[in-house]
Amino acid sequence: MMYHIPGVLSPQDVARFREQLGQAEWVDGRVTTGAQGAQVKNNQQVDTRSTLYAALQNEVLNAVNQHALFFAAALPRTLSTPLFNRYQNNETYGFHVDGAVRSHPQNGWMRTDLSATLFLSDPESYDGGELVVNDTFGQHRVKLPAGDLVLYPSSSLHCVTPVTRGVRVASFMWIQSMIRDDKKRAMLFELDKNIQSLKSRYGESEEILSLLNLYHNLLREWSEI
């Protein structure tokens, strides 16, 4: 399942990020890619050794950790260190698959259940640059407003189409979920959304409490902590 998570960053935050990224040190994006990805990757990434990078990635982590919809959809156990990429002048990233595991500075290793892209450029400011994700339901093309995030299974083949005008800047990361199975995670998300909708419409009730109990018992049964 793919999920659109709106408003992870406010317009003011986006403007500040873009200003700071305009002063960043950019390097060849292939430095963080395996052998397969390096053959089809042509973009730039912020140098992870820079002081600016350390500050920006912490801000992204804080933003996603505080976003209730992101938590409900991803049920994150571990978040990778966010990275930042830039596409311009026909740069692109061909179809590839993300690695199943990644090194993590605190946990040693993490499993990549979900991939996330946080858009930092206004969609009208560049041509091309769509995130294209293939899954069992077909092909999905994603180009979201600045400050919005898309979540999708890391098991999906995906690419970024060439940017033929302007500049596309984004942050991206991977998530190890408490719920490994995509279908179970999707069911919990739907249950959670409906519980919240019923609470806002009718207030607290015994039936809602029973559904909440069901949600937490399923989370307890399925989660890997």
Curated annotation (Swiss-Prot):
Entry EC number(s): 1.14.11.-
GO BP, sorted A to Z: DNA damage response; intracellular iron ion homeostasis
Enzyme class: oxidoreductase
Domain annotation Fe2OG dioxygenase: ranges: 78-177
Keywords of the record: Dioxygenase, Iron, Metal-binding, Oxidoreductase, Vitamin C
PROSITE patterns linked to this entry: FE2OG_OXY
Cofactor notes: Binds 1 Fe(2+) ion per subunit.
Domain of life: Bacteria
A Gene Ontology molecular function term of the record: iron ion binding
Protein name (database record): PKHD-type hydroxylase YbiX
Residues binding 2-oxoglutarate: R168
Cofactor(s) listed in the protein's UniProt record: Fe(2+); L-ascorbate
HAMAP family referenced in this protein's UniProt entry, alphabetically: Hydroxyl_YbiX
Binding site for Fe cation: H96, D98, H158
Organism: Shigella dysenteriae serotype 1 (strain Sd197)
